[in-house]
Amino acid sequence: MCRGDSPGVAGGSGEHCLGGDDGDDGRPRLACVGAIARGFAHLWLQAATLGFVGSVVLSRGPYADAMSGAFVIGSTGLGFLRAPPAFARPPTRVCAWLRLVGGGAAVALWSLGEAGAPPGVPGPATQCLALGAAYAALLVLADDVHPLFLLAPRPLFVGTLGVVVGGLTIGGSARYWWIDPRAAAALTAAVVAGLGTTAAGDSFSKACPRHRRFCVVSAVESPPPRYAPEDAERPTDHGPLLPSTHHQRSPRVCGDGAARPENIWVPVVTFAGALALAACAARGSDAAPSGPVLPLWPQVFVGGHAAAGLTELCQTLAPRDLTDPLLFAYVGFQVVNHGLMFVVPDIAVYAMLGGAVWISLTQVLGLRRRLHKDPDAGPWAAATLRGLFFSVYALGFAAGVLVRPRMAASRRSG
């Protein structure tokens, strides 16, 4: 598909796609576009699978609470797990196989029925297999987005966020489809079989080296680009060379304070606190004759995303970085919100949950801006960014579990 006509240029930039006169101007050829599109489709499918398992399979059955807790805690922890680029391929391949085997076994047990479990309701063995498949899918997904989260050009990073957010949202909303359990099992089987034992990196690697470098998706197979990241969107202009960071660990976490503890843990801790308050509200309304607990949670979750998008637009127009000022504003908002808990507790819970979604995504985007300016940040910084992003959705699934039983009861009564 590709050949090189300038072997002396660093980074293999002389390699270009065959098939036209436009191979030298950086425009992707059809084969490369197809490979990259398949890679992003794979990202979306993995995220949708993770959302589906987290919201449907694990939130039913006699051990739903324990399994949901294991899913949330495990997903949050695995999201922060470092994946060194030099050793990422073999574990990813193993996880892809585990995802297929565990997911297939879970679907088989779910369809055939487990001893002692009602029809259509997963038993403990099914839930354990599904949990293992979810963990494996998360590890593969985390490895696939690792280079895209760290040094990818801004449009590609935003596209990656959109693809993963879309997949997680589609999968997480499966509880509201109200499809027959057999249809749900068939859909899950199709997704598991479609993913197979491959990862998005397998599709990305089929693009030519020039376009792999342009998309910064070959970091799991080769050293990171040694060019200034601000020039990454101009494939024909390489910019100044930077010191190589491959096969060596940076002595610092990241530069310019990009991984300050308050930037990472305040959103996660406040989200966990919001969930605790939501759980108290759920327990307090158990005796209610009708109506779901937290009926507006999906709208609040989407509203948090919309607020993060508007904040990012304001950041684009602002002359300085707003990441830290927004964090302090959020802390002040929480102080006021705690006072509202004694006056309008329902609104305060929603405000706390929506604010947690907003500040978490805002901090992800802010941290990524800082990491993009510091290519010597190291894999721990990318893992921190990635983990915070996945934590938003792991905790979002936990909030959704509080909604589902009451909504199901409300639907049956209607």
Swiss-Prot record:
GO cellular component: a single term: viral tegument
Main location: membrane
Basic and acidic residues bias locations: 228-237
InterPro entries documented for this protein: Herpes_UL43 (IPR007764)
Coiled-coil zones: none
Record has Membrane as a keyword: yes
Source superkingdom: Viruses
Keywords on record: Membrane, Transmembrane, Transmembrane helix
Subcellular localization: Membrane
Statement: the UniProt record of this protein carries the keyword Chloroplast: no
Entry membrane topology: Multi-pass membrane protein
TM spans (from-to): 39-59, 61-81, 96-116, 121-141, 148-168, 184-204, 339-359, 383-403
Residue segments, region Disordered: 225-253
Family: Belongs to the alphaherpesvirinae HHV-1 UL43 family.
Name assigned to this protein: Membrane protein UL43
Source organism: Human herpesvirus 2 (strain HG52) (HHV-2)
Native organism taxonomy: Viruses, Duplodnaviria, Heunggongvirae, Peploviricota, Herviviricetes
